[in-house]
């Protein structure tokens, strides 16, 4: 029975991940966003020249991700709350439905067990993703929605990130994207997690352009200052610094 319960729990987790990312997709579309990519675990569906293609990608700290291309900025603004919280909203809605199904079919052992697991996990997903917090190396949806609602520059940075993601999905390299997207934010602005990501992308663009010395100086600066750089991005910057050092001076104090 324990083994069966474990399998049912894994199935419930997977279903709620799909529901969560589906919520981002549905509420993103309602908000005027266009589909870019949809990932569950390491399976990612992307739009490429009007066709949906399957790719493989694993991102640490996330079970799934739905990325969409944002609408054009109007007076420096775009709708962000529904897109960011759409996953949690869908988890809550589905949890209520599954709880109702449990109440109706509570006499059927395995089905009722799956329904209550789906309801509980749905509520858990809604809380963990909807209540603003930093989860390991990435910020959750609630944290993003809160950051965007407080900072106009962060909102602009969010738009840039989504456009970069859209172009990357289409196979466009960073060095071939608009230079205006990669302006390094001020040290003060870098304290915002969303804006800090643009600084990281600026480093990535310099790396793609093989301007390694400039990239190394910028990465060193960004890693030293008090910033909101997410743990995942910070670790990737460290990896890039190691790479630059290995192909350059190989200074022991750096390595």
Predicted regions: what they are:
Residues 8-72:
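Small-residue-rich helix-interface/hinge motifs
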Residues 176-186, 212-225, 250-255:
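Alpha-helical repeat scaffolds
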Residues 1-7, 107-121:
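Hydrophobic alpha-helical transmembrane segments
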Residues 191-200, 229-239:
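Generic helix N-cap/helix-start motif at coil->alpha-helix transitions
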Residues 144-195, 199-203:
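Charged, amphipathic alpha-helical linkers/stalks
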Residues 114-134:
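Alpha-helical membrane-embedded segments
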Residues 34-36, 130-155:
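Juxtamembrane/interfacial segments flanking transmembrane helices
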